[in-house]
Amino acid sequence: MRQILLIVAAMLLTCCSSESDMNAQTNTNMGKTLIVYYSYTGNCREIVNSLAAQVTADQLEIQPAEKGLKYEANGYALGTQLLNAIKANPDDAASYPAIDPVSVSLADYQNIIIVTPLWWSQMAAIMQTYLFQSRDQMAGKTVALIVSSHSSGISGVVADAQRLLPSVTWAGDALWVNASNHSNRASLISTWLPTLNFQTTATAISHVNADRQQHRAYTLSGTLAQAGRKGIVIVDGKKYVR
């Protein structure tokens, strides 16, 4: 992954007394990454295992509320029924199949990697449910997509992801893992990861408690800036370049 270097030196504030009592509270996600996946046949779980060996990330598995369903039975009748219901009313929560409750807070993460199977040229309905329910929490996140299919192209899944997550920043092109290259997935992932434009540090100081008088400078990650460091400094709402 590309390292995003913060060259902005950040805030100067006026503080009181010789020993200023300043407490910079920074964003806590600090570029943390979450892998969100749904796996019906087990292929996506294998992809996640290979991915987890190469990137530091937490994992969240999405599960359907109703267990044991055979989505592929009778010519994929049930899977097609679920997808058609979503296509008919994509903005209606009732159109999406129920999933198990999720306790993970997306506020703890800046980067999200979605790993999903393809169902008849579309994103699996179970993953669509999670993204529909989480679209507001994902706003402003940096997101990457891995799609597993047998042989079908993934443009329909990419379109579903873009529809469901209109307010995210896409880190790069989606990775397609199919039946012919699944055994080579680790190599595919290692080639793909460096192409992603993921955020790896915090981007802001969320809150500063300060008394007035003495000046101190803090970086955007919340650490005390070194004396003489070049960058953009804000003093009493005015921007200075030093």
Question: Which role does the model predict for each range below?
Answer:
Residues Y40-N43, P64-G68, L118-Q122, S149-G153, ...:
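Solvent-exposed loop/turn segments at secondary-structure junctions
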Residues M1-T26:
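Bacterial Sec-dependent N-terminal signal peptides
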Residues N23-I114, M123, S190, P194:
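N-terminal beta1-alpha1-beta2 submodule of the flavodoxin-like/Rossmannoid cofactor-binding fold
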Residues S18, Q199-T223:
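Residue-level detector of functionally pivotal "anchor" positions at catalytic/ligand-binding pockets or at interdomain
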Residues T169-T201:
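Glycine-rich phosphate/pyrophosphate-binding loop and the adjoining helix
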Residues A77-S167:
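Helix-loop-strand module that forms the ligand-binding subsite of alpha/beta enzymes
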Residues I232-R242:
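C-terminal tail/sorting-segment detector
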